[in-house]
Structures are given as C-alpha cells and as structure tokens.
Amino acid sequence: MALSFSLLMAVLVLSYKSICSLGCDLPQTHSLGNRRALILLGQMGRISPFSCLKDRHDFRIPQEEFDGNQFQKAQAISVLHEMIQQTFNLFSTEDSSAAWEQSLLEKFSTELYQQLNDLEACVIQEVGVEETPLMNEDSILAVRKYFQRITLYLIERKYSPCAWEVVRAEIMRSLSFSTNLQKRLRRKD
C-alpha cells in the first residue's frame, strides 16, 4: 500500500512537471535518466550473478530495433518509449515488489516514469513531423515480443530470485542498447 501511495504521488508530481515543460530535449534528459536508471538497477541486485549462471537465458533482444541508422527519429523515439513502458510494466507487478528492496524499486520506477513523460512529449512532437506507421508498428511489436519472452521466463521459473537476477541483467543490457541508440540520434541532430 505504501508503494502504491508513494508511486501515485511521484506520478502526480512528475505529470505536473512534464505538463509545464514544453519541447523535446530527448538526447539530454533521456540519456541522463537512462544512466540513473542503470545505476539504480545495478544497486537492486540482491544475489551474486555467478550463483545464477545455470539460469541464464537468451531473450533475443531485438538489436536491429536499437540501430539508429535504420530508421527515422520518430521511429527511434517510439522504440525507446515502448522499451521503457514495458520495463516500467515489468517492474510494477506484485511479483516484482516481492523481489526487490522497496525504496530502490520506487526510485527506479519513478525514474522510468519520468523518462516515459519525456518520451511521450517527444513522440507527439516527432510523429507529427515524420510518418512511419508501418515500420513503427513492426518495431514496437518486436519490443513487445521481447518483453513477452522475459515475462514467460519469469513465469516458467516461478519468479525465483535467480530468474529475477537474470532479468535484471537483461534489462540493464536493453537500457545500455537504449543509451547507444540515443547517442546515435544525438549525432544525427
């Protein structure tokens, strides 16, 4: 209950902040937020990754969706938004609450939510400029399938501590891909 109230308050504050700010400064704000999220996710580890080597799994991250050379800025921003949205959803479950230290989980969720707000403003701004709906749908579907594989893995492993550790490492990897995509976008601007 405390997590829900804290998260609700954070959502309200962050929503107000995003409504008051105009424009799309994606490269700077999102990149910093991504780094903070990576640091928090790194701090969330509870068990040694070496004790979970037998639980490793290839989730087949859709690397081509993080290749900023393949598509327009609007599509890249949509992919980043979907990746952060799916990460937020994954770490907002009851099973996730049981797996992680609550204050770190709240900070991580708040950071993701802020990134979602920043990205939503950019999606609205960029999609009006560049229309690539079919490519966007394919890219977003690839990201959703990736997170579906992660969720199925957690279910199959009964949300064990090692399963969550493997997923935590995988999400760190996907956030790193996201950071690299942002660097490429910055170079294009």
Curated annotation (Swiss-Prot):
Keywords, in A-Z order: Antiviral defense, Cytokine, Disulfide bond, Secreted, Signal
Subcellular location: Secreted
Signal peptide segment: 1-23
Domain of life, per lineage: Eukaryota
S-S pairs: 24-122, 52-162
Xref: SUPFAM superfamilies: 4-helical cytokines (SSF47266)
Molecular functions (GO terms): cytokine activity; type I interferon receptor binding
CDD domains, A to Z: IFab
TM stretches of this protein: none
GO terms, biological process: adaptive immune response; B cell activation involved in immune response; cellular response to virus; defense response to virus; humoral immune response; natural killer cell activation involved in immune response; response to exogenous dsRNA; T cell activation involved in immune response
One Pfam family matching this protein: Interferon
GO cellular component labels: extracellular region; extracellular space
Coiled-coil ranges (or none): none
Record keyword Signal present: yes
Protein family per UniProt: Belongs to the alpha/beta interferon family.
Role according to the record: Produced by macrophages, IFN-alpha have antiviral activities. Interferon stimulates the production of two enzymes: a protein kinase and an oligoadenylate synthetase.
Name recorded for this polypeptide: Interferon alpha-10
Encoding gene (name): IFNA10
